[in-house]
Structures are given as C-alpha cells and as structure tokens.
C-alpha cells in the first residue's frame, strides 16, 4: 500500500471504515485487508485469548455448542474486520508469528519474520481476519485460530519468552498487561499512575 501518513496513522486510523474520524477501538468496522502499509506489521495468528466476559456471552448465546461458538467468532470478525464482541464491547489478546514487516515499521524490538509474539493490546482495535477456529480451551477462554492480524506502530508486541506456555502467557497478559508495560517504563524516579478497575 502507498505511503500517505498523518500523525494519527501510527494508531491505525486509516484502517477505520466506519464511522469515520475515530480510533480503531471505537470503530464499528475496520479494513482488514491482508496487504500492509509500510509502517505496519502482519502477524499470522495462532491463538486468541477472548476477554472472559466476551467468551461467556458467546458461549451462552450459542448454548455452549462449540460449533456454533466457532461460527460466531468467525461472524464477528467477518462483519467488523476485528474480533470485537458488539454485545460486551470487549476484545482479547492474540499470539502468533510475525509474517511480514513494513519497511517503515518502527521496529524498536528488532522483530524478525518468524518471531513468536504476543500482542499486548486489545483485539477491539486490531484489524484481523480468520479463516477457521479450532480447539476451544474453556479454562483459559482461549481458541486456536487460523488467520492474520495487522498491528500498527503504537501497538505493543512482545517477543514470546522462552519456557512459558502460551496459554499461561495470554492469561497473564490479559490480567496484567498494563503492569508489564509499566515495569518497562518505570525506571529511575519516574512517577507512574495506573488507572483501572479490578486491579486487586
């Protein structure tokens, strides 16, 4: 895709289809085309951690029928261009493998094609396209998927730490991903304020 950048595009605004002039998490629908802009990165998604409220809502709506749950997840992604549950207004996290890196992507972590990564930002704001949903792991509210997602410069990607199971990593980052980022930023005598609910 061509370069045509303004200062909000590192947050993914050019991927917004509707409504116009909002950030991706607030959009109803995103452009999830596979081709990337020069400052984007594409990830081959292998597993998704659904936010627990979303997982429960989908499960109840589908009568705990896993075939229906798979179709529902695919339907949400097809209609919205992202895995953003319209009932609960929540997303989740993803794990996958770096597939392509744009030439202008701000690659501070020096990621390479083939690196395993966890996206430490909600799927509510990330363009994604899934072709299939596989195994469902109810204990962790996670599903195996085949497909891809597009990340922007301001989306935090974390190289998978060795020796820790993916299901536990996704679960932990879903619960305390902000604290992980704070641990990297809170150096010296910096003052950090964490605002949220259900922290304890």
Question: What are the language-model segments listed below?
Answer:
Residues 1-26:
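N-terminal intrinsically disordered, low-complexity, charge/repeat-rich segments that act as generic
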Residues 21-33, 78-81, 94, 177:
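Short linear interaction motifs
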Residues 34-49, 61-124:
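Glycine-rich beta-strand-centered segment in the early N-terminal region that forms part
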Residues 92, 116-191:
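NAD(P)H dinucleotide-binding glycine-rich loop of Rossmann-like/cofactor-binding domains
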Residues 177, 198-200:
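Residue-level detector of alpha-helix initiation sites
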Residues 192-198:
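Conserved N-terminal Rossmann-fold NAD(P)-binding element of oxidoreductases
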